[in-house]
Each structure stands twice: as C-alpha cells, then as structure tokens.
C-alpha cells in the first residue's frame, strides 16, 4: 500500500462514525483490490492488537475458519453458545475443531438457558423487544466479554454483502465496539463460497442438505420455503441481525 499507514485504534476512537469511515476510505479502496487470501495476510500483518475470528459455525462457516487458520493456525475462534443451537451444529463444531485443529474459545451468558426461561420466559416469543433482549444476553454480552478477556484489537468475521440488506454496504475494514472489524470475504458470492468449499474439500453445515440457508438457534431458525429469502428464515422475519455485528454504546440486560 503506497506510503499509507493504517490509523491506530486510539486515533480512530476519537472520531465519530462518519469520520472513521472517511479516515479508512483509502485503506478500504486498497483492500477491495485484493483477494480474500491477500486481505487476511494484510490484516494479520497490519492491524494492531491480538486477533480473533468469531464464528457461529453456520452453513458456510468452514470458509473463514479454513481461510484464517491456513495463515495463522492458532488464531482464537470465538463461539457464543446460547445453549439452543441445533444438535447438528454442536456436531459440526466438534468436526471442524478436530479437523482444523481450532483454538476454540466458547463464551456463554452467565445465566444458563433454563434459568433464563424460568426468569424471563421464552424471550424469543416476546416480539422484537424480547428477541433483542435475548440476543443481548446470549450473544452480545458474551462476545464483548470475549473481546475484553482475550484483549482483542482486531476481530475477523465472515459477513458477506450478499447475505442481507443490512450487510449490503459494509466495508472490509471498520471500527466496531472499540476494535477493528475485518471482513475478508464481504464481497464473495454464494458461488465463490461453494467453489472454495469444494476446492478445499470442506463441508457445508449438515442442515444445508435439509434446506436451511442460515442456521442459528433452534427456536428462531426456519427451513427455507419457496418465496422466502435468506433474511426471512431467521427471527421469524422480524429482524436479520442478532446484534453481534452492530455497534453498542452500552450493554444492559
């Protein structure tokens, strides 16, 4: 990258979101010209702090897990376990952890799933507000804790623009919740994902064969039906994001 250094987190955190975006424009323009593999190498070499990859071990999770561990084999892989994942997901986690020798770090809410139900009822049945509270407790807070405890400065994720409208304009590099957020496959299509998995002999999530396009918790994931898009298969179509990939100024339950 011609005579340009990446701004420090300290500098970027003094700016508002618009200023951060502008400050990172030239960096992102450069990153758009690189392959995903080149972006990973660039990110590991140029972005400060400890690095980590978050994974939900969803339908296409093997792509990012393979892409990152091929370059940095011991990178921490953070999973936020709600206690309500599909049995097939837990089996998929075990399979990929063994196969790729993952440095898996599992984080969960301080209160168990059963205790939460006793205390709050089934939050996912309580409309958008209930779903957001559920996600805050089971996904956002555990991920925040992981970033803090592992002292993460750069967070890698496998989000892709094609997945939803809320992700359609995301840049490769941004700042989220005080750390660098880096999305190496943000511009990949489903076709590119398919061929990467095929070329590297990597599996889709087991539920892919049963018609699932996206997999999260058992109670908020639907199998794809004709006429549905991917966004409508999660959270009863009420929302797409679980909150994990959104900026939060504060954390509360």
Swiss-Prot record:
CDD domains on file: PAPS_reductase
An example Gene Ontology molecular-function term: phosphoadenylyl-sulfate reductase (thioredoxin) activity
Biological process (GO), any one: hydrogen sulfide biosynthetic process
Phylogenetic placement of the source organism: Bacteria, Pseudomonadati, Pseudomonadota, Gammaproteobacteria, Vibrionales
Protein name, as recorded: Phosphoadenosine 5'-phosphosulfate reductase
Classification via NCBIfam families: cysH (TIGR00434), PAPS_reductase (TIGR02057), PRK02090.1 (NF002537)
Organism annotation: Vibrio cholerae serotype O1 (strain ATCC 39315 / El Tor Inaba N16961)
UniProt KW keywords: Cytoplasm, Oxidoreductase
EC category: oxidoreductase
Record EC number: 1.8.4.8
Protein location: Cytoplasm
Disulfide bond positions: none
Gene name in the database record: cysH
Protein's pathway: Sulfur metabolism; hydrogen sulfide biosynthesis; sulfite from sulfate: step 3/3
Sequence similarity: Belongs to the PAPS reductase family. CysH subfamily.
Classification via InterPro entries: PAPS/APS_Rdtase, PAPS_reduct_dom, PAPS_reductase_CysH, Rossmann-like_a/b/a_fold
Major location category of this protein: cytoplasm
Active-site residues, Swiss-Prot/TrEMBL: 242 (nucleophile)
Catalytic activity: [thioredoxin]-disulfide + sulfite + adenosine 3',5'-bisphosphate + 2 H(+) = [thioredoxin]-dithiol + 3'-phosphoadenylyl sulfate
Its job: Catalyzes the formation of sulfite from phosphoadenosine 5'-phosphosulfate (PAPS) using thioredoxin as an electron donor.
GO cellular component labels: cytoplasm
Superkingdom per UniProt: Bacteria
């Amino acid at each position: 990258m011609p005579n340009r250094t990446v701004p420090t987190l300290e500098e970027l955190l003094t700016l508002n979101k618009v200023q951060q975006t502008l400050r990172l424009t030239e960096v992102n323009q450069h990153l758009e010209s690189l392959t995903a593999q080149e972006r990973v190498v660039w990110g590991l070499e140029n972005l400060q702090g400890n690095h980590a990859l978050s994974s939900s071990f969803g339908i296409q999770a093997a792509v990012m897990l393979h892409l990152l561990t091929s370059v940095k084999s011991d990178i921490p892989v953070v999973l936020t376990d709600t206690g309500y994942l599909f049995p097939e997901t837990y089996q998929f986690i075990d399979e990929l952890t063994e196969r790729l020798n993952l440095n898996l770090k599992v984080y969960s809410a301080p209160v168990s799933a059963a205790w939460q139900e006793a205390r709050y009822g089934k939050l996912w049945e309580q409309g958008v507000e209930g779903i957001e509270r559920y996600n805050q407790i089971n996904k956002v807070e555990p991920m925040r804790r992981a970033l803090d405890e592992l002292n993460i400065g750069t967070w890698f994720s496998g989000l892709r623009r094609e997945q939803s409208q809320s992700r359609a304009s995301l840049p490769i590099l941004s700042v989220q919740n005080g750390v660098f957020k880096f999305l190496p496959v943000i511009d990949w299509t489903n076709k590119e994902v398919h061929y990467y998995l095929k070329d590297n002999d990597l599996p889709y999530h087991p539920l892919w064969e049963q018609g699932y396009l996206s997999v999260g918790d058992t109670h908020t994931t639907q199998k794809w039906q004709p006429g549905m898009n991917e966004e409508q298969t999660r959270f009863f179509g009420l929302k797409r994001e679980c909150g994990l990939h959104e900026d939060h100024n504060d954390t509360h339950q």
